[in-house]
Amino acid sequence: MKLILSSSPHAHAKNSVSSMMRDVIIALLPAAGCSVWFVGMRAVWLIAVCIAASVVTEAVCRIAMKRENSIGDFSAVLTGLLLALNLPPDLPLWMAVAGSVFAIAVAKQVFGGLGYNPFNPALSARAFMLISFTGAMTTWSNPVGYESVTGATSVDAVTCATPLMFIKKGDVSQLTSLKSFLLGNIGGCIGETCAVALLIGAAYLIVRKVITWHIPVSFLATMFVFALFKGGVPPILHVLSGGAIIGACFMATDYVTSPITAKGKIVFGIGCGLLTMCIRSGGGYPEGVSFAILIMNAVTPLINRYTQPKPFGRK
């Protein structure tokens, strides 16, 4: 299906919107499945609660605003799923509900609904939760077999340090298995740890022409080059750690909040990669993907303005 893009607000036929949303949901299923494998029923509850709260909030908002019901476009389902995959496994469920309500009501419907929101709703909710529930959002439990990555034992079963925490300290000796980074047997948010599952999903979206390669490649390549020049930690660990892959492939590529031209997408991806590494290197929080993408969301209209081809004859 060939998609024609224009500057926001984006207006799509219902079928095109719902089909795109379904494709992204399908692409996230491998990562969701891995989260259940490593975390167990806690992941199932987080995903179910976030999706349910997002859908209910969408319905209530549309009724309150006296606008057409938009549940059928699956955008609320996708927002709930993305938010859940960006949450730590032991987060209290009421906090997940609060984040879902914020994502739909504040970050999306206040601006008029899908196509009008300037910032990615799931990332906006995650930023809100990091500020509001800092302790819960930065407490991690060990996945199955976590000792294969960090040497942790059953004594450490309640909480653990994520790879990004070790990377920020420069203590790469604690990270012993690249295979575990690829397969997801590491601490972190439930849907961000299995690089293979996320890359399979991204490949599916590219084949389906739902996204292009420009943002994911420029985002991750910028991170790699930055880490290469910075030294200290192997660049591949930066790319495979935290929310880099899920952010680059599934959040930075959001149609509504990202540039519309190939050149603009590359500029956007480079900006996301640079900001992510700057925040990781100099910020107080070891992760920077969410805030980097949100900052670049704000710059998207400017990028669109300067990267759109000029009409023939205009100087």
Regions found by a protein language model. Give the residues of each.
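Cytosolic-side transmembrane-helix boundaries in multi-pass membrane proteins
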Residues: 1-22, 259, 279-315
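N-terminal signal-anchor module of multipass membrane proteins
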Residues: 1-55, 62, 310-313
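C-terminal ends of transmembrane helices
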Residues: 8, 56-68, 104-115, 200-208, ...
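Hydrophobic alpha-helical segments embedded in the membrane of multi-pass proteins
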Residues: 26, 52, 74-82, 97, ...
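Structural signature of hydrophobic alpha-helical transmembrane segments
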Residues: 40-53, 90-99, 181, 185-195, ...
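A generic, well-ordered mixed alpha/beta core segment in the N-terminal half of proteins
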Residues: 75-151
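Long hydrophobic alpha-helical segments that form multi-pass transmembrane helix bundles
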Residues: 116, 121-198
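Loop-to-transmembrane alpha-helix initiation sites
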Residues: 118, 122-123, 236-244, 264-268, ...
